[in-house]
Amino acid sequence: MPNDEAFSKPSTPSEAPHAPGVPPQGRAGGFGKASGALVGAASGSSAGGSSRGGGSGSGASDLGAGSKKSPRLPKCARCRNHGYASPLKGHKRFCMWRDCQCKKCNLIAERQRVMAAQVALRRQQAQEEELGISHPIPLPSAAELLVKRENNGSNPCLMTECSGTSQPPPASVPTTAASEGRMVIQDIPAVTSRGHVENTPDLVSDSTYYSSFYQPSLFPYYNNLYNCPQYSMALAADSASGEVGNPLGGSPVKNSLRGLPGPYVPGQTGNQWQMKNMENRHAMSSQYRMHSYYPPPSYLGQSVPQFFTFEDAPSYPEARASVFSPPSSQDSGLVSLSSSSPISNKSTKAVLECEPASEPSSFTVTPVIEEDE
């Protein structure tokens, strides 16, 4: 059809679809702008033209004059590579060479990808500048990682720069990058920021840093993480009852010693404590019988070890004989916890026999037994 060819290709005077003597069609000016102008000029110069032909010729000449100002229509590049000129609008899905893998079409596809990436990058930078997130910065060299160094001169903390010249970044970069919020790798926390190590170049396993998680408590009675409290609540209960009203006349400290667990009984040394055998220390499983990782608490002497065994205390033969004398007490800690109730048995008597005989005037066994009875 001549009108379609005129729409797809710009017609030249040698390719005019109509002869000069042929009367024009009324719709010729609506399809092709150049062909309509030629048809209008031919109809105006023809002798047998009517007034309708002259009117259409003048309208087509107006369209031809307006065509110079209109923007050009983009053409399909793939069709152009293969010798065809097709307008690009609405043509992408119907292009016969959209899946072509020839050299020219591959080059076109690669250029399209690059242009799309550049457009997206410019759009993102414009949005970030409008929001005030970032500012345009010069890109680093090809193989250089922008890792800030500690104190601008020490060795890098976790990563090393991959550049061949290994030039340190300028001194203004670490200070201004963090303030301006640039999209760079943030500061790696320095080892010196922990407050206990000075000028360490690399990350090392510090015993002082990890031991700060396991600091001993402020109360020396609970010095072990895995140990039960060494002093039970019966001590406070008995000491309070002994201080309020004590018919025995003895010291309340001595009377409150009945509330101590079985392993801790007073020896002849006064404030120091001796332990019974390790098996009867606590009625618990073996996983809690762990030695403390910390030095002995403050209530023990400097030269006194934390745990006593049979071999550790050779200088107390009398006290050791009296401490380990009761054979029937499986765990005297249970007896000491319930010592506030009126119970009279061999275990309580055995615990009371463990009191030192060096102070007979201040405390005796007989009044306690009579009170229990």
UniProtKB/Swiss-Prot annotation:
Biased composition (Gly residues): 46-58
Domain of life: Eukaryota
UniProt name for this protein: Doublesex- and mab-3-related transcription factor 1
Major localisation: nucleus
Any one GO molecular-function label of the UniProt entry: DNA-binding transcription factor activity, RNA polymerase II-specific
Disorder cited: Testicular germ cell tumor: A common malignancy in males representing 95% of all testicular neoplasms. TGCTs have various pathologic subtypes including: unclassified intratubular germ cell neoplasia, seminoma (including cases with syncytiotrophoblastic cells), spermatocytic seminoma, embryonal carcinoma, yolk sac tumor, choriocarcinoma, and teratoma. 46,XY sex reversal 4: A condition characterized by male-to-female sex reversal in the presence of a normal 46,XY karyotype. Patients display complete or partial gonadal dysgenesis and a chromosome 9p deletion.
Compositional bias annotation for Low complexity: 34-45, 59-68, 328-347
GO biological process: cell morphogenesis; germ cell migration; intracellular signal transduction; male germ cell proliferation; male sex determination; male sex differentiation; meiosis I; negative regulation of meiotic nuclear division
Family that this chain belongs to: Belongs to the DMRT family.
GO CC, one annotated term: female germ cell nucleus
Residues with Phosphoserine modification: 339
Function of the molecule: Transcription factor that plays a key role in male sex determination and differentiation by controlling testis development and male germ cell proliferation. Plays a central role in spermatogonia by inhibiting meiosis in undifferentiated spermatogonia and promoting mitosis, leading to spermatogonial development and allowing abundant and continuous production of sperm.
The species this protein was found in: Homo sapiens
Residue segments, region Disordered: 1-72, 319-373
Compartment annotation: Nucleus
Annotated SMART domains: DM
Gene expressing this chain: DMRT1
DNA-binding region(s) in UniProt: 72-118
Lineage: Eukaryota, Metazoa, Chordata, Craniata, Vertebrata
Keyword Phosphoprotein appears in the UniProt entry: yes
